From Swiss-Prot:
Organism: Human parainfluenza 2 virus (strain Toshiba) (HPIV-2)
Cross-referenced InterPro entries: Paramyx_V_Zn-bd, Soyouz_module
Quaternary organization: Interacts with host IFIH1/MDA5 and DHX58/LGP2. Forms with host DDB1, CUL4A, STAT1 and STAT2 the HPIV2 virus V-dependent complex (VDC); this complex targets host STAT2 to proteasomal degradation.
Zinc listed as a keyword: yes
UniProt GO cellular component terms: host cell nucleus
Function: Plays an essential role in the inhibition of host immune response. Prevents the establishment of cellular antiviral state by blocking interferon-alpha/beta (IFN-alpha/beta) production and signaling pathway. Interacts with host IFIH1/MDA5 and DHX58/LGP2 to inhibit the transduction pathway involved in the activation of IFN-beta promoter, thus protecting the virus against cell antiviral state. Efficiently blocks type I IFN signaling following infection by targeting host STAT2 for proteasomal degradation. Also plays a role in viral growth by promoting host RhoA-induced F-actin formation.
Name of protein: Non-structural protein V
Amino acid sequence: MAEEPTYTTEQVDELIHAGLGTVDFFLSRPIDAQSSLGKGSIPPGVTAVLTSAAETKSKPVAAGPVKPRRKKVISNTTPYTIADNIPPEKLPINTPIPNPLLPLARPHGKMTDIDIVTGNITEGSYKGVELAKLGKQTLLTRFTSNEPVSSAGSAQDPNFKRGGANRERARGNHRREWSIAWVGDQVKVFEWCNPRCAPVTASARKFTCTCGSCPSICGECEGDH
């Protein structure tokens, strides 16, 4: 077996001194791509030659001004408007929590409250009540094969009217619109009138007539408030 090479104390001190000198050299100044070493920049030779070559190849780079870090500013402004800032646990007993499905700013119309348990109706027209009953029944039977108990709102209902058959509507009239939401044991139906020429939107919006033939008030919206 080949004998392991041995070094004298002077040789070890010289190697350590050369290595620490190289480290101090690169740590004392900034390094860019030009001063970094590659295989082509290191000539063959002993440690002293390699260290001298590295010192010769490296180019001093002027240190640029240190850019201050931007401080992140945290704004306390709420990015949205809260309708009710009172926590639910601090509300009085039996106080209904505002329903997010109902719009905060509504046009003039009627609000009907229907208690599903007792069947009590506070206010509203016949159409809105029947529409709420039909919507509740459709929701409860949508995943079953049972026939609905009531035929309210169907074609067999004497109060049923199919749209588009009346020529008077084409000349300009009002269109009754509804917004239905379930809040606990209550069904809330909000209804209002829009001109027949107004677009149909998903939100409760009040439009004005653009065709010039729709009346300002019809028989259905006379009692709206």
